[in-house]
Amino acid sequence: MAIRAGAMLATTAAVGFGTKIAATRGIRAIAAGNRATESAYAQAPAAATVSGGDGSAVSFDSLGLQGRRLVLEATDADTIKAVMGEPQRQPPVRVYVGVESAPSVEERVELAITELEKTGGFERSRIVVASPAGTGYVNYIAIEACELFARGDVATVAIQYGSLPSMLSLDKVSEASSLYAALIGRLRSHIDDNDLEISLFAYGESLGALSGQNGILEVSKQGSGPIDGALWVGTPTGSALFEELTHERGVPIFDRPSQLAAYIDEGNTVPDATLLNHDNDPVTKFTLSSFYSMPDWLKASDRGRGVHPAQRWLPGIAFFQGLIDTKNAATVVPGEFGSTGHDYRADLAVFVMIAFGFSDVDDEQLKNTEAQLRTSEVQRSLNIAEGKL
């Protein structure tokens, strides 16, 4: 018996060790994949208004897969003219600093400031500070919409903190939050110290919304009003700022564009922080406590759009169902924009327009923008399908 028990323990230990090795290798492979170079995004940009381009302080190779995609897809003058029916005011600026662009948080932040100076970012009327997801991904749709509405007169800046998907980057939230706080604080100081007439906006989606909100809360404790507005999309549970905004300040949570439009039509001003969370987004509702306790949203008489009225809570089962739903939440078809679950693509144009103060956009321009965003996404998917070098 003792020999058999010892053999079982040894087998269990071996399986556990092997699983750990396999998981570690898998994570390393994912990270390596997010540093790889794609065929369609292999050539450094020539423009002096994006990172990795002419005169840039950031090397193109250090941007990683997500950064290279972002800087190579800045909206061009012809597209702005075709969509908006007006000439470009200025070329849009896209600044991206990768995890390999500089070794420390402080150096990455300073590199971002230097890069904004070199690319002309501080000469734009708006700067959007994007809080990336775990891989370094910044939602291209939101940024392109912003560039179209601004007729190019906008700069976007983002600093990468990791190379793994959001579900594998939860241990990076604290680091990402501190990085975002440092960037926001440094930008606010630079704008104020130089008397620049620039509106500073925050943007984050999913894990980027969580870390971005934590960063805003952190820098707000050091002074008041670090930003001029924010758009937070699909915020996961656990954000202290989200709780403060909704429970203490009464900031509304919007499920869809029509709700935001109705809110404004009622005479309300645009919230300092515009919150977009779908009623049926599993990412915004998943909690560890759902394993043993019914969440509040299931107790509500009106569960909201897209939530099945017959959905029930069962101990343990609901937790794993939520985990599966969260994992599958980002499954989408390129160009077919949805407004459900964790797919916010159909909502973004309207929310960007209102949250960032683009009051000079008419219905035709909005319609054209939404069509262009779909076209761009289809082309992007074709580019990505070409594969890696």
Q: What spans do the regions from the language model cover?
A:
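C-terminal His-loop and adjacent cap/lid subdomain of alpha/beta-hydrolase
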Residues: 1-198, 218-389
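Gly/Ala-rich beta-loop-alpha elbow adjacent to hydrolase catalytic centers
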Residues: 202-209
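Short glycine-enriched nucleophile-adjacent loop
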Residues: 209-221
